[in-house]
Amino acid sequence: MDIRCVNWFENKGETKYIYLKAINRESNVIFIRFNYYYHYVYDASKELEYKPNECIDLGPFKIINIDEKLSTDIRYVEPRNYYTSELVLVKDLKRNREKQYLQEYLDITWFYLLNNITPDGCYKIDIEHLTPIKKDCYHCDDVSKVFIQEIPIFEVKFTYLLFDIECQFDKKFPSVFVNPISHISCWIIDKVTEYKFTLINTDILPDKEPSILHHKDFSPKDRITYCTEIVMLLIMKKILEHRFDFVITFNGNNFDIRYISGRLEILEKSFIYFSLPDATETVKLKIFERFVTGGTFTNKTYHINNNNGVMFFDLYAFIQKTERLDSYKLDSISKNIFNCNVAIKEIDDTILTLEATVKDNSKDKLSIFSRVLETGNYITIGDNNVSKIVYKDINQDSFIIKVISNRDYEIGSVHNISFGKDDVDLKDMYKNYNLEIALDMERYCIHDACLCKYIWDYYRVPSKINAASSTYLLPQSLALEYRASTLIKGPLLKLLLEERVIYTRKITKVRYPYIGGKVFLPSQKTFENNVMIFDYNSLYPNVCIYGNLSPEKLVCILLNSNKLESEINMRTIKSKYPYPEYVCVSCESRLSDYYSEIIVYDRREKGIIPKLLEMFIGKRKEYKNLLKTASTTIESTLYDSLQYIYKIIANSVYGLMGFSNSTLYSYSSAKTCTTIGRNMITYLDSIMNGAVWENDKLILADFPRNIFSGETMFNKELEVPNMNESFKFRSVYGDTDSIFSEISTKDIEKTAKIAKHLEHIINTKILHANFKIEFEAIYTQLILQSKKKYTTIKYLANYKPGDKPIRVNKGTSETRRDVALFHKHMIQRYKDMLMKLLMESKGQQEITRLILQSLETDMISEFTHNREFEKYLLSRKHHNNYKSATHSNFELVKRYNLENTEKIEIGERYYYIYICDISLPWQKKLCNILSYEVIADSKFYLPKDKRIFYEIYFKRIASEVVNLLTDKTQCMLFFSRLFGTKPVFSSD
């Protein structure tokens, strides 16, 4: 039999088993049970106090102590301790045995490695060597006899349950103790057919009789079933206990499933149960919480404790982890991914006829949108015009819809439409609840259930799950849950076993700070000439590979008391550990009593971390090449997911070296990596800053050299193609792995040509070994506000005459989600004005005067005439990591949640606005501004006796504008006159 592995799971009882859920070519499910063993690695000579189930000789391993020892005298540098020992792997049924080596690795990873199993692989199995237990469930005692060979991946049909519920409520958020469920909409996708249906509660519809009286009378073929809430809950109990491959919800683990389970217990004293495929264990549905701390907030995820092989997948938690959005409500996510362009074909009073074709959209975008349109009831035109759909005509490459809208539009105009929030107020609907409203709500509910599948398909979640499972050697149900420090353990254990190396530590890990990447100060604020951008390719991974930065390759760490001692010690240590066999790097000291430290790495044999990185980079290249030749959709989606997973994990290695809780923790390796990275970007800056292209010669600012040996590689003067013109180069900024080089021309075509020549010269004459740079782009009209904040017009590296540039805002207020739309528009306008005045060669004093004059006029006009509040909305993320338990932000949300049904959850962004009494005149002095904050939800409107507190917004805008200008005197006078204070000027 040919099978595809789709999930692995364990039972909850004391006698542990591993279960494989597999699907054969006929899309039938089989379960295979394996004995669960705990794995312990010992020296072969060690006498055990217990009799293990099995001992496996691993052979000789190099045991390396990777504790970092500090030396203060070069004469007494201690060599790294290691020895070779014969090891044995013990498999035992009991946990918590004494462990000697490799204790931090997961038992399931050992299972995969020892049996040479890929978690998501396809295999030819010999069913004769399996022992039948129950129908479609077998026990396996000998994996090698059952799993005959791995075969190419084949497609199987998964089964799905997607559902959404609506609960009756009045003012507050629904309570499981008080509020009944009014609707449950489901989409069941089976091997052969699909069912879309809704259960409607007749207990709250007195004029409607139930269509069934018992849950056994239910048929999923009926589009709508009317029944009592108890019957509805018993139907869902049976459905949820069924062994689907996936149960997909949006925040269902926290709300929908919890609510159904709670109502079932309250009304019927019944519970949802899950059973193992071998029927040896049954568990009651429980929801457990897992906390993930990151940044400024703690994120909580919810998980179902099932044991039946079903993957309960919460799209809400998945998207929170993978996307950076203003809001993680279903309508916001839908709006973000399901959108297209339409042309207005006809306007008949309030009815708009909209047409979408391949002329204004890609085929993929149109196809995805059309699919969602099948169940959609409302679309959003532009940012906020929610319009009801009254007619649909969906074709293969186009669609026509008619919507109701009171807004003014022009025939022929093109607009972006999206699936956002349906324009329904559930609270009002329940207030006037009847059969007609119940049916209207049903359309809303079934659409939300279907949206889960559309989002699932859009993100290609199964492909991502399988790619992660295969790469990290984890069960599919866990592959997307863990953090990088756990995910790396599978590939690392595999490599350690292959290389026959084991790391040990005797000293407790100590966390020290270290300096990160080099960020140059901007040389000035604005640039009229073009700026070329050059990036190092995978700088940190390549630094680790070249320097052989791996904990077992660390030779010594020498502390220096002062600069003179540092220089003397460096000369001595380089003679003792010569390049290229070794690399000696001077870094900042980890101890405050010392001036610096010299770290030495042995490059003679490749270390574990460089091998790990080369494997990840090589695998990514392999899958990118396979992606180009993929012949089926399943292959292309899998290879794309795999290359992406390998990119992510390769980039995470450097971070894990500096993370004390990681298996890969190596403080010296992380610090040396960033030090070499800073040296590489500084070296490139020294070569390019002041270089000149004179006709057919390039005169560099310094001699190209090997930064590790100091050896000069080429002359400063290099031959280049004759441009019959001279160009000067000046470094104006740099950040970690990229350098911004200004060229003395405004001609895009010439700049692109020269930059490509420079890329080749830098890679062949200036850099060496595996270090390479790439010409990324040309920036024109660059405004460098400060470190990591700039605005520019960007031309791509492969520029051809006629290509249109794009505007780029990086780190500026235009890209920040906590900045008001009005602020963004104003800053963009004044940056455009600044560049225009610079191109006109106006003087700095004149530029400052004109901009401040215009800014004051605009602010006075806005203060006098505006009543639109939407463009003044700000947003922030709700979290509970404030130092004070009564922080004003937290209290603001707390008060809002007490009064509103749509609660703001931890980790979610919300909008707020500053408003004050309309009678309040212009306020020069702003005090206690937090007291003027009001949360602005979808129903918010500006009260007649209030005005926007413009002064708060204007002061922030003015602060940013004056930091773009050079005449500080004019700026201070302007600020004092309008706001009664001096502006704060940026120091970088």
UniProtKB/Swiss-Prot annotation:
Transmembrane segments: none annotated. Pfam families: DNA_pol_B, DNA_pol_B_3, DNA_pol_B_exo1, DNAP_B_exo_N. Gene3D superfamilies: Helix hairpin bin, Palm domain of DNA polymerase, Ribonuclease H-like superfamily/Ribonuclease H. Signal peptide: none annotated. SUPFAM superfamilies: DNA/RNA polymerases, Ribonuclease H-like. It comes from the Viruses. InterPro entries: DNA-dir_DNA_pol_B, DNA-dir_DNA_pol_B_CS, DNA-dir_DNA_pol_B_exonuc, DNA-dir_DNA_pol_B_multi_dom, DNA-dir_DNA_pol_B_vir_insert, DNA/RNA_pol_sf, DNA_pol_palm_dom_sf, DNA_pol_type-B. Its EC number is 2.7.7.7. Belongs to the DNA polymerase type-B family. Catalyzes DNA synthesis. Acquires processivity by associating with a heterodimeric processivity factor comprised of the viral A20 and D4 proteins, thereby forming the DNA polymerase holoenzyme. Displays 3'- to 5' exonuclease activity. Might participate in viral DNA recombination. Does not perform translesion synthesis across an abasic site. Interacts with A20. Component of the Uracil-DNA glycosylase(UDG)-A20-polymerase complex; A20 and UDG form a heterodimeric processivity factor that associates with E9 to form the processive polymerase holoenzyme. This is DNA polymerase. The gene is POL.
